[in-house]
Amino acid sequence: MNDPRIIVALDFPDQCTALNFAAGLDSTLCRVKVGKELFTLAGPQLVEKLMKLGFDVFLDLKFHDIPNTVAAACSAASSLGVWMVNVHALGGSKMLLAARQALDGKRTRLIAVTLLTSLNQNDLSELGIADTPETMVQRLALLAQRCGLDGVVCSALEAVSLREVTGEDFCLVTPGIRSFGDGNDDQARIATPAMAIRSGASYLVIGRPITRSPDPLGALRRFNDEVASVL
C-alpha cells in the first residue's frame, strides 16, 4: 500500500489556484492539507475535487469546542471522505473522547494539535503556562493517546521524546519542515525532512518550500528522496 510521508500544505487564497497547483503534483508522492482559509473560501467541494485528483486529504481545521459540537464536526469531515482530521488537545478529555467516538469504525484518522509550532517559551509564559513547550507537548500527547486518538501534531524537536513515551504505532505529524538555507517563516520549531524522520516523525507537513518553489514537483521529489534516504 502506498503511504506517502509528505503532506503538502495547500495554503492558497482561492480554489482555482489550489486545484491548478495540486494538478501539477504527483498523488503517489504526497498527500495534501487543506486549512481554515482555503476551506472557508472553497468548502467541501474543494475536498471532493482534490480526492478526484487522487489525493488523500488532511482537513486541518483544528476543531476546539464543546464535545457534542466537535463530535458532529468530525463526523461531517469523515462523511467527506477525508483521510485525516484534527482537534485541539487543549479541548480536554471529554472533547477528545467525543471526537474519537464519532469516528469509530470510519477510515478517517484523528489526531490532536498539541502546541502550535509558532509558540515558544515566552509565548507560553504570556498565557500563564510555566511548563516548557516540550513538557506541555508531552502531556497533551499522552492525553490524546489515552483518549484513543491516532496521533498528534508536534515539532520534530519534540518527536524523539514523544516516540519514546507513546510507542511506535502512535502517529506523529510534523510541520515546520525546511531544507537547509530556507527561511523560518513564522514557525519557531523547524527541522529538515531527514532530521524529522530520524526523530520519529510519521508524516511531514511541507508548505512554502514546495508551494513557492519555481519547480514544485521537483521540490517534492527532492524532499521524498531525502525521506527515503533515512527510512
Curated annotation (Swiss-Prot):
Its EC number is 4.1.1.23. Homodimer. The active site is at K62 (proton donor). It comes from Nitrosomonas europaea (strain ATCC 19718 / CIP 103999 / KCTC 2705 / NBRC 14298). Substrate binds at residues 11, 33, 60-69, 117, 178, 187, 207-208. The gene is pyrF. This is Orotidine 5'-phosphate decarboxylase. One of its GO terms (molecular function) is orotidine-5'-phosphate decarboxylase activity. Catalyzes the decarboxylation of orotidine 5'-monophosphate (OMP) to uridine 5'-monophosphate (UMP). InterPro entries: Aldolase_TIM, OMPdecase, OMPdecase_AS, OMPdecase_bac, OMPdeCOase_dom, RibuloseP-bd_barrel. SMART domains: OMPdecase. It comes from the Bacteria.
